[in-house]
């Protein structure tokens, strides 16, 4: 009788473990050569390795839609620039049609597993275009992102901050989906590009096959000015300075700056889930992320060691700067079990 009971318990445990290991989750992210793309793909790898879940990842998505899909329970995980929950909560920009009540309701359904710097917005052009930098935007055609979403919102804001120009009045904007970005950069559709960048950036590296590129830093006076400081206070935006020598380019790229630093607005975000995700699942996913930081996440692409994965300091995560979403309780448990401190304002 004792033997039968023991065997029964073992069988039950095995079935429970098997069911947990075979959990299938869905995830949406940006292009696979971007920080959000690599990050979510890495999560699928560490989740499988830890036998937490099988995550089916769809890349090349517009994250505006992906974040809403998570809030509505249509997708389990999405990469989310933190500006998007802010826009959703206010029902403005790409979420204007939701209405404030619906937007606030959807935002209340979002929670964070971990954060990272998605990109630093910047201006660049092929040397062959004879483009003159920030002072030369007027009257030009600028590729500034996909048809809707955080990248386009941030690009328009950055151009207005630097030049005072608005799309359609001072310059012509070109938008295409991320899957067509490299082609659009290379085919001459635009004079210059104001896009999210990693260091080194995959799109720029691919574009070098068509010629040398120049990147323009934000002018120091603009970076230190009152207007930019206001922009830096927008949830999901942090000021970034980086030594040009650490940007990761070995040739074909010139960086224009008054000194040896690149300056720009950084976009931070993270992997979001629905608040209704099981506590143990959120904890297991976050634990798998923490355990895979060095051998998976930071080793996955040249720009990943530069992307602030594994940070919990709110100066880098921007979790409490008007950000309407918090960490999932399961994620908090995983972080704290691993010895990290999560600020109370982010719980």
Please describe what each predicted stretch is.
Residues 1-7:
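Bacterial N-terminal signal peptides that target proteins for export
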Residues 8-9, 19:
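Cleavable N-terminal signal peptides
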Residues 15-21:
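Sec/Tat signal peptide C-region and signal peptidase I cleavage site
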Residues 22-56, 119-187, 198-201, 325-330:
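Bilobed "Venus flytrap"/periplasmic-binding protein-like clamshell domains
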Residues 25, 39, 197-211, 215-223, ...:
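An extracytoplasmic/periplasmic, membrane-proximal ligand-sensing/linker region
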Residues 71-115:
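N-terminal segment of the mature folded domain
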Residues 82-83, 91-93, 99-102, 127-129, ...:
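Pocket-lining segment of extracytoplasmic ligand-binding domains
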Residues 133, 138-157, 235-284, 288-311:
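Ligand-binding clefts/hinges and TM-proximal coupling segments of bilobed small-molecule sensing domains
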């Amino acid at each position: 009788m004792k033997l039968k009971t023991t065997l029964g318990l073992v069988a039950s445990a095995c079935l429970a473990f098997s069911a947990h290991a075979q959990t299938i989750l869905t995830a949406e992210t940006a292009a696979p050569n971007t920080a959000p793309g690599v990050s979510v793909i890495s999560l699928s790898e560490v989740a499988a390795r830890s036998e937490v879940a099988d995550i089916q990842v769809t890349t090349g998505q517009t994250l505006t839609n992906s974040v809403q899909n998570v809030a509505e329970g249509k997708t389990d995980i999405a990469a989310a620039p933190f500006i998007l929950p802010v826009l959703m909560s206010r029902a403005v920009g790409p979420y204007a049609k939701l209405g404030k009540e619906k937007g606030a309701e959807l935002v209340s359904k979002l929670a964070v597993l971990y954060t990272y710097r998605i990109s630093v917005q910047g201006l660049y052009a092929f040397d062959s275009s004879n483009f003159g930098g920030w002072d030369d935007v007027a009257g030009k055609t600028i590729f500034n992102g996909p048809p809707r979403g955080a990248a386009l919102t941030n690009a328009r804001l950055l151009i207005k901050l630097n030049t005072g120009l608005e799309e359609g009045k001072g310059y012509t904007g070109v938008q295409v989906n991320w899957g067509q970005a490299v082609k659009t950069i290379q085919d001459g559709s635009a004079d210059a590009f104001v896009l999210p960048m990693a260091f080194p950036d995959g799109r720029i590296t691919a574009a070098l096959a068509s010629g040398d590129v120049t990147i323009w830093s934000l002018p120091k006076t603009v970076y230190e000015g009152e207007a930019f400081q206001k922009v830096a206070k927008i949830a999901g935006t942090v000021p970034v300075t980086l030594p040009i020598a650490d940007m990761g380019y070995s040739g074909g790229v010139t960086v224009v700056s008054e000194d040896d630093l690149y300056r720009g607005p950084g976009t931070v975000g993270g992997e979001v889930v629905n608040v209704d995700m099981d506590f143990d699942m959120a904890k297991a996913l976050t634990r798998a992320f923490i355990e895979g930081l060095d051998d998976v996440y930071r080793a996955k692409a040249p720009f990943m060691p530069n992307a602030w994965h594994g940070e919990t300091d709110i100066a880098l995560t921007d979790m409490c700067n008007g950000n309407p979403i918090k960490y999932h309780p399961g994620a908090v448990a995983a972080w704290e079990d691993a010895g990290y401190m999560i600020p109370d304002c982010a719980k």
